[in-house]
């Protein structure tokens, strides 16, 4: 296992599916401009600001609200977006707090929202954050390092039953029982402090045949711990409805997910919005029962070979987008 991260002077980060995301949001931004008002778009997972930079560069009248729970990301994106500081509001918050953020800034509705879910390149590449299993680091995994329990807290304090549950549920790991058992046995000797020691315990718990064919043996467990530490799926279940509710008529929501658990949540909510709420077989569809959203993507879209070549981390991305076509249903 490597003990140091990649060099700090690595090539400039290329946002996942940048052009496709911007193109999906473009009609809503342009429609606002044609209506004589400044479009407002929320980048709900700002990260290093690459998607926001692309939008602000392309649309000179756009006002962008960037939200991130990671203060380091806000600092870096703030520097990147400094040329546009008169058209941006960058906010330290979790993206399920979008309603409160908009209220605080005085915006009643927005024309677009972008969510790029999961862990960011910044978090993966910063060794001391503890997100990666490829090199040793403190076992942290918090997206907001100023609050909340760390991954070390989870592996050292959760019962074996609780560990089995989260590793199986959030990591979809079929060897969850073996891994949890080994973790509990190892921590009885010495509490976990670093990612390296956890990786070694997981490696020994996963059968050799499975380790040879299923990718890195720690991948699913690390995903589970990260989701648990940051309450990612709980946040997502609140964030998607809040973001879509904030859309003006013609506004668009673009969401990129990276594993099936995220995509299922997004798919379920979008499917409800694009479907009539009238009872099956009911002879009349009231206006209040008509779909409030329109699908912009054919199911879930995946990256092209060219997009993966531009950013290999795009390989697992799944993209969904909708447009608000009617006011929000109230019942």
Swiss-Prot record:
<keyword id="KW-0808">Transferase</keyword>
<feature type="binding site">
    <location>
        <begin position="49"/>
        <end position="51"/>
    </location>
    <ligand>
        <name>S-adenosyl-L-methionine</name>
    </ligand>
</feature>
<dbReference type="GO" id="GO:0071424">
    <property type="term" value="F:rRNA (cytosine-N4-)-methyltransferase activity"/>
</dbReference>
<protein>
    <recommendedName>
        <fullName>Ribosomal RNA small subunit methyltransferase H</fullName>
        <ecNumber>2.1.1.199</ecNumber>
    </recommendedName>
</protein>
<feature type="binding site">
    <location>
        <position position="116"/>
    </location>
    <ligand>
        <name>S-adenosyl-L-methionine</name>
    </ligand>
</feature>
<comment type="function">
    <text>Specifically methylates the N4 position of cytidine in position 1402 (C1402) of 16S rRNA.</text>
</comment>
<dbReference type="InterPro" id="IPR029063">
    <property type="entry name" value="SAM-dependent_MTases_sf"/>
</dbReference>
<dbReference type="InterPro" id="IPR023397">
    <property type="entry name" value="SAM-dep_MeTrfase_MraW_recog"/>
</dbReference>
<feature type="binding site">
    <location>
        <position position="102"/>
    </location>
    <ligand>
        <name>S-adenosyl-L-methionine</name>
    </ligand>
</feature>
<dbReference type="Pfam" id="PF01795">
    <property type="entry name" value="Methyltransf_5"/>
</dbReference>
<keyword id="KW-0489">Methyltransferase</keyword>
<keyword id="KW-0949">S-adenosyl-L-methionine</keyword>
<keyword id="KW-0963">Cytoplasm</keyword>
<keyword id="KW-0698">rRNA processing</keyword>
<feature type="binding site">
    <location>
        <position position="123"/>
    </location>
    <ligand>
        <name>S-adenosyl-L-methionine</name>
    </ligand>
</feature>
<comment type="similarity">
    <text>Belongs to the methyltransferase superfamily. RsmH family.</text>
</comment>
<feature type="binding site">
    <location>
        <position position="68"/>
    </location>
    <ligand>
        <name>S-adenosyl-L-methionine</name>
    </ligand>
</feature>
<dbReference type="GO" id="GO:0005737">
    <property type="term" value="C:cytoplasm"/>
</dbReference>
<dbReference type="GO" id="GO:0070475">
    <property type="term" value="P:rRNA base methylation"/>
</dbReference>
<dbReference type="InterPro" id="IPR002903">
    <property type="entry name" value="RsmH"/>
</dbReference>
């Amino acid at each position: 296992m490597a003990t140091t991260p990649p060099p700090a002077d690595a090539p400039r980060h290329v946002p996942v599916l940048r052009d496709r995301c911007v193109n999906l949001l473009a009609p809503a931004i342009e429609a606002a401009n044609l209506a004589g008002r400044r479009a407002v778009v929320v980048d709900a997972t700002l990260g290093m600001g690459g998607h926001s930079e692309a939008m602000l560069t392309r649309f000179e009248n756009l006002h962008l609200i960037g939200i991130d729970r990671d203060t380091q990301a806000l600092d870096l994106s703030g520097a990147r977006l400094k040329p546009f500081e008169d058209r941006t509001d960058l906010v330290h918050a979790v993206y399920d707090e979008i309603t409160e953020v908009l209220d605080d800034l005085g915006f009643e509705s927005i024309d677009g929202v972008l969510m790029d879910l999961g862990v960011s390149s910044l978090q993966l590449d910063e060794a001391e954050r503890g997100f990666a299993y490829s090199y040793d680091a403190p076992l942290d995994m918090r997206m907001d390092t100023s609050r909340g329990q760390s991954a070390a807290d989870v592996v050292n304090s959760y019962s074996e039953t609780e560990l089995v549950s989260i590793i199986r549920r959030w990591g979809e790991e079929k060897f969850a029982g073996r891994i949890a058992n080994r973790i509990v046995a190892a921590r009885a000797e010495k509490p976990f402090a670093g990612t390296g020691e956890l990786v070694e315990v997981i490696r020994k718990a996963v059968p050799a045949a499975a380790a040879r064919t299923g990718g890195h043996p720690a991948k699913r467990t690390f995903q589970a711990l990260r989701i648990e530490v940051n309450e990612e799926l709980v946040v997502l279940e609140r964030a998607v409805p809040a973001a879509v509710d904030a859309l003006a008529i013609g506004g668009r929501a673009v969401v990129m997910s990276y594993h099936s658990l995220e995509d299922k949540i997004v798919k379920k909510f979008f499917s409800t919005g694009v479907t009539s709420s009238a009872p099956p077989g009911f002879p009349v569809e009231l206006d209040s029962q008509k779909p409030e959203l329109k699908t912009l993507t054919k199911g879930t879209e995946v990256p092209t070979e060219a997009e993966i070549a531009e950013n290999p981390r795009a390989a697992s991305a799944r993209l969904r987008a909708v447009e608000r076509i009617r006011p929000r249903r109230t019942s």
